[in-house]
C-alpha cells in the first residue's frame, strides 16, 4: 500500500536532486539529469551514440496560450536539457521560459506516477495499492459497462481538461482522441467553464473568428494598452513583443489593480479598483462623445450602430416592409441555408429607409421615431443613452481613476490612434466579466480602434483552423459503424447538484462515474469544498495523470500518463502561436506510464469498441490533417514529421482589417435581438441587461461597496506564478527556490491596520472556506485587496486552500467561473 499524503519524502531531497540529477546554470536552465529516483533505471542507449547529444522536436503543451516550440536534447537515452526551437520564417515566435527550461526536471520528477493504482483508503487520503494495467483497464471497463447497461451511456461523464493541448493525448484540444472516445461511448462532458467571458464577448461582437493582431503590426501602433492582464508573468513569450513595440515608438499604458512588472516597464500606469474597468470605459466614452471623438464613419459602415430596433427588440428588416426574405448560401457551421432579409437603416441622403447595403449615408441620429408604422430607435441612440449618466466624475467615484486620467484615456482612444488593446484572462475572473469585455470592445468600435492597421485586440485565440476535427471525433469504426454521439454537456456549476441529487432540472440524471484527464479540478475549479463533495459522492472516479495531483488523491483508479516528450503528438491549439508543432518521441515512457493516446485506445477496446480505435498515431494525425486548409498549405503527416513545424498562412495578421467582421452582414454587433444564455439551469434572465452590448454592473464581492464587504472587508485575487502553469510544475523541486510557498500580499496600510508584519501567519476566510499562509507586505498592492499567487497544491498550504474561498455561481448568461470575485476577512495567527 502506498500512502501519498503522509509521505515526508518524495524520493529526492532538494540537495540530492541537485547533486545527483541536475545542475542549474547561471541562467537557470537544467543542463543534465540522471536516474537517481528509486525504481528509475537508465534507458538502454544506442552504444554507437554514447556521449552524443541528439536533438528532438518538442512542444510545451500546457495551457498558458503560448505553445513554445522546443528542442529536446537527449544524451545516452536521457533528456538533459531543452532549448528554444528555431522558427526561421518568424523568429519572434522563438521562445522558452523557466517552465520550458525545467521540463527535464518534470520528466525525472520524484512526483511522477509510476504504475496504475487502486484506492484502498478513504477518498482523498492518498492510500493506494499497486495494480497491473490489465487489472486497471478491466476494472474500469467492468464498472462502466455495468453503469451503461443499468443507467445508460450518460451515467458516465468525461472531464476533459486543457492541460495537454495535443491531438493524440489532449482533452479539449481540437479533435482529440479523448473526444473521439467520449463520442463513441455516448458519455457526457463536464465543461470546465473557465475563462469564457473574454471569448464569449469577442465572438458575440465580432463574430465566430479570431481577432488577434499579429506582432508584425504592433510597431505601427501609437499606443498599446495592457488592460487587466499580466503578460510579464502569464504570457512571458509575448512580453518582449510589447517592449519591442515600445522601442519602436508606441506608448505603453497599463491599466491594472496593482503595481507589477508590466507597470514597471510602462510609460503610464492607471490603477483601477477591482472589477470596475467597465465603469472606467463608460467614463471614457462619456468624454469621447462630449468631445465628438467617436469615429462616425466607422460606426456607419462597419457596425450595427445605425440599425433600427423595433419595440420587440428585433431589427427592422426588409420583410417588415413587404419584401420577402430569400434563401441564401448554406452556412458551413450549421449545414442549413442562410436567410437573406437585410436590416434597414435610415438613409440621410434620401431621407428614407433603405437596406443597409444600399444606403448612401446611414444615419446615426436625426431619425424619425416611426417608420412604416413601426416605432423604432437606432442602436446608436441607445448607446448614447447608456453612456449619458456616466460622466467622468461619476466613473471616477466608482473606479478610482482620477477624472483627468479618464479624459486622457478618452483622448488616447479618440484622437491618438491607432491603439492596440491587450487583454488576456484577468478580467475574466469576476461575476461581471462579460459586461467588462463588452464595454472595452465597444470602446474600440466607437473610436475606430479595430479593423484598421495596427489597431485591435492583441490577445486573441481559438482554433488553429487547419484540422479535420469533426472527422476525427466522429470517425466510424473499421466496419463502417457510426459512433453513438456525445452525451449532454454538464456545466461545472451544476455538477455537484447532479451527483448529489441524481437529477437535473427536476428530471432523473443518474451520473455514476467521472473520468478526468489533462486536468486537476480540485485545485483549478472554483469553490473547492464543493468540488471535493462531488468527488466524494461520485460512485467511481478515474483519474489519468502524470503526478499525484490533488485530484489524483481522490481517484478509485489512478492511471499513470507519460510525459509529453515520451510520446509522439502534435500541439494543435493556436492562441498566439500560428504554428502546428510536431512532438517527437524523444525517450521511452518511464516506469509503467503510458501515452494518453494508448490509454484512450485501451479503454475503448476494453469497452467493446475496438473497431473504433483501429488506428495508429500516424493514422489519426493524418485524418486530423485531412482538411481543405491543410491541403492548401501542403501539410501532411509525412511533411510535418520532416519539418517539425507548419504555419497556417490562412491566419491573417489582422483578421478584421478593413472593418470586415465575421457575420453575414460583415458588421460588428452592438445589439442582441434574441438573448440566449450559454447554459440552462433554470435561471431567471433579465434580458434588459443583455440586448445592448454596452451595460455594466458591479462585481458581486470584489465591489468595494458590496454589502458583504462589511463582514469580509478584503477582496482577493490570485495571480499566475512564473514557475508554474496552473498547478503543473508543482513537482519541480528546485523551482521552489524562486517561489517557495503560498503567500498573501498586503498593502502596507492594511497590514498596519491589521497588526500584520512581514512573515506573519494569517488566515483568510469566508463562509465557503479558508486558507492559512504567510503574509508579505507590498507597497504596490491596492488597498483592501490581497494578492495570493496561486497554483499551489492543498498540501503545500499551511492549512486550507486558496481555491476554497471562491464561489461557484455564474452570471445569468455566461458560463464563466469567477476566480477573483471573492471577499474575505483576515485573522492573524
Each language-model region and where it sits:
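Flexible glycine/proline-rich, aromatic-decorated loop/lid segments
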Residues: 261, 549-582
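N-terminal export/assembly segments and adjacent metallocofactor-ligating motifs
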Residues: 2-297, 301-363, 375, 393-394, ...
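Extended redox/cofactor-interaction regions of prokaryotic respiratory oxidoreductases
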Residues: 2-3, 172-243, 248-254, 279, ...
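Long, contiguous, secondary-structure-rich segments that constitute the structural scaffold
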Residues: 596-640, 727, 732-745, 749-829
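N-terminal leader/propeptide and maturation segments of large enzyme subunits in energy/redox metabolism
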Residues: 119-135, 293-403, 586-671, 738-740, ...
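Glycine-rich phosphate/diphosphate-binding loops that line cofactor/substrate pockets in enzymes
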Residues: 137-156, 214-222, 385-386, 407-420, ...
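Short beta-alpha connecting loops at secondary-structure transitions
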Residues: 266-272, 579-589
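Conserved short loop/turn motifs at secondary-structure junctions
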Residues: 159-168, 394-401, 424-431, 463-464, ...
Amino acid at each position: 500500500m502506498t500512502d501519498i499524503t503522509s509521505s515526508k519524502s518524495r524520493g529526492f531531497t532538494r540537495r540530492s536532486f541537485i547533486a545527483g540529477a541536475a545542475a542549474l546554470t547561471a541562467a537557470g536552465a537544467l543542463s543534465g539529469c540522471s536516474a537517481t529516483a528509486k525504481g528509475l533505471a537508465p534507458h538502454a542507449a544506442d552504444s554507437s551514440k554514447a556521449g552524443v547529444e541528439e536533438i528532438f522536436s518538442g512542444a510545451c503543451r500546457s495551457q498558458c496560450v503560448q505553445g513554445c516550440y522546443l528542442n529536446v536534447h537527449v544524451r545516452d537515452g536521457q533528456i538533459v536539457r531543452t532549448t528554444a526551437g528555431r522558427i526561421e520564417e518568424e523568429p519572434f515566435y522563438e521562445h522558452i521560459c523557466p517552465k520550458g527550461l525545467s521540463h527535464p526536471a518534470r520528466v525525472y520528477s520524484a512526483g511522477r506516477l509510476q504504475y496504475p493504482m487502486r484506492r484502498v483508503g478513504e477518498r482523498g487520503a492518498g492510500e493506494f495499492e499497486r495494480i497491473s494495467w490489465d487489472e486497471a483497464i478491466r476494472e474500469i471497463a467492468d464498472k462502466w459497462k455495468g453503469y451503461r447497461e443499468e443507467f445508460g451511456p450518460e451515467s458516465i461523464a468525461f472531464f476533459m481538461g486543457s492541460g495537454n493541448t495535443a491531438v493524440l493525448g489532449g482533452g479539449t484540444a481540437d479533435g482529440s482522441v479523448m473526444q473521439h472516445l467520449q463520442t463513441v461511448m455516448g458519455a457526457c462532458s463536464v465543461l470546465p467553464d473557465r475563462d469564457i467571458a473574454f471569448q464569449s464577448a469577442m465572438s458575440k461582437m465580432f463574430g465566430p473568428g479570431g481577432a488577434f493582431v499579429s506582432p508584425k503590426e504592433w510597431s505601427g501602433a501609437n499606443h498599446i494598452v495592457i488592460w487587466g492582464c499580466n503578460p510579464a508573468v502569464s504570457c512571458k513569450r509575448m512580453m518582449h513583443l510589447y517592449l519591442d513595440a515600445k522601442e519602436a515608438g508606441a506608448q505603453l499604458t497599463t491599466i491594472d489593480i496593482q503595481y507589477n512588472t508590466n507597470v514597471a516597464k510602462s510609460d503610464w500606469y492607471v490603477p483601477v479598483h477591482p472589477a470596475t474597468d467597465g465603469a472606467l470605459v463608460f467614463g471614457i466614452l462619456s468624454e469621447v462623445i462630449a468631445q465628438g471623438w467617436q469615429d462616425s464613419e466607422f460606426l456607419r459602415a462597419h457596425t450595427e450602430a445605425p440599425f433600427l430596433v423595433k419595440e420587440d427588440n428585433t431589427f427592422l428588416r426588409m420583410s417588415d416592409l413587404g419584401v420577402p426574405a430569400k434563401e441564401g448560401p448554406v452556412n458551413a457551421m450549421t449545414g442549413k441555408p442562410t436567410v437573406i432579409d437585410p436590416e434597414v437603416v435610415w438613409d440621410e441622403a434620401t431621407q428614407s429607409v433603405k437596406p443597409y447595403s444600399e444606403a448612401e449615408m446611414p444615419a446615426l441620429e436625426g431619425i424619425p421615431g416611426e417608420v412604416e408604422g413601426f416605432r423604432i430607435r437606432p442602436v446608436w441612440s441607445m448607446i448614447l443613452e447608456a453612456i449619458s449618466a456616466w460622466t467622468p466624475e461619476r466613473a471616477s467615484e466608482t473606479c478610482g481613476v482620477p477624472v483627468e486620467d479618464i479624459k486622457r484615456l478618452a483622448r488616447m482612444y479618440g484622437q491618438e490612434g491607432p491603439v492596440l488593446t491587450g487583454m488576456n484572462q484577468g478580467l475574466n475572473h469576476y461575476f461581471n466579466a462579460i459586461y467588462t469585455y463588452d464595454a472595452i470592445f465597444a470602446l474600440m468600435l466607437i473610436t475606430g480602434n479595430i479593423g484598421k492597421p495596427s489597431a485591435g485586440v492583441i490577445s486573441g485565440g481559438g482554433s488553429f483552423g487547419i484540422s479535420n476535427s469533426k472527422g476525427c471525433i466522429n470517425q466510424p469504426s473499421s466496419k463502417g459503424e457510426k459512433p453513438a454521439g456525445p452525451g449532454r454537456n454538464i456545466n461545472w456549476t451544476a455538477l455537484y447538484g447532479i451527483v448529489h441529487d441524481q437529477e437535473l432540472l427536476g428530471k432523473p440524471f443518474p451520473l455514476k462515474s467521472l473520468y478526468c484527464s489533462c486536468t486537476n479540478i480540485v485545485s483549478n475549479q472554483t469553490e473547492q469544498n464543493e468540488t471535493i463533495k462531488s468527488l466524494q459522492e461520485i460512485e467511481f472516479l478515474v483519474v489519468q495523470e502524470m503526478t499525484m495531483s490533488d485530484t489524483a488523491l481522490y481517484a478509485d483508479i489512478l492511471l499513470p500518463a507519460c510525459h509529453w516528450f515520451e510520446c509522439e503528438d502534435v500541439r494543435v491549439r493556436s492562441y498566439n502561436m500560428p504554428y502546428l508543432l510536431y512532438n517527437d518521441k524523444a525517450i521511452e515512457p518511464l516506469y509503467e506510464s503510458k501515452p494518453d493516446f494508448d490509454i484512450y485506445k485501451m479503454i475503448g477496446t476494453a469497452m467493446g469498441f475496438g473497431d473504433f480505435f483501429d488506428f495508429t498515431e500516424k493514422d489519426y494525425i493524418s485524418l486530423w490533417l485531412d482538411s481543405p486548409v491543410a491541403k492548401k498549405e501542403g501539410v501532411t503527416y509525412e511533411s510535418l514529421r520532416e519539418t517539425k513545424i507548419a504555419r497556417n498562412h490562412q491566419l491573417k495578421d489582422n483578421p478584421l482589417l478593413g472593418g470586415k467582421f465575421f457575420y453575414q452582414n460583415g458588421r460588428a454587433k452592438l445589439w442582441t435581438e434574441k438573448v440566449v444564455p450559454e447554459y440552462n439551469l433554470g435561471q431567471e434572465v433579465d434580458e434588459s441587461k443583455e440586448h445592448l452590448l454596452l451595460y455594466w454592473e458591479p462585481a458581486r464581492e470584489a465591489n468595494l461597496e458590496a454589502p458583504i464587504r462589511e463582514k469580509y472587508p478584503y477582496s482577493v485575487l490570485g495571480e499566475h506564478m512564473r514557475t508554474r502553469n496552473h498547478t503543473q510544475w508543482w513537482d519541480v523541486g528546485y523551482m521552489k527556490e524562486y517561489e517557495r510557498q503560498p503567500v498573501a500580499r498586503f498593502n502596507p496600510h492594511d497590514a498596519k491596520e491589521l497588526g500584520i508584519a512581514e512573515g506573519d501567519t494569517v488566515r483568510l476566510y469566508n463562509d465557503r472556506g479558508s486558507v492559512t499562509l504567510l503574509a508579505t507586505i507590498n507597497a504596490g498592492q491596492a488597498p483592501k485587496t490581497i494578492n495570493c499567487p496561486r497554483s499551489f497544491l492543498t498540501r503545500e498550504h499551511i492549512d486550507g486552500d486558496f481555491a476554497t474561498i471562491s464561489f461557484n455561481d455564474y452570471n445569468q448568461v455566461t458560463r464563466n467561473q469567477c476566480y477573483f470575485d471573492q471577499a474575505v476577512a483576515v485573522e492573524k495567527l
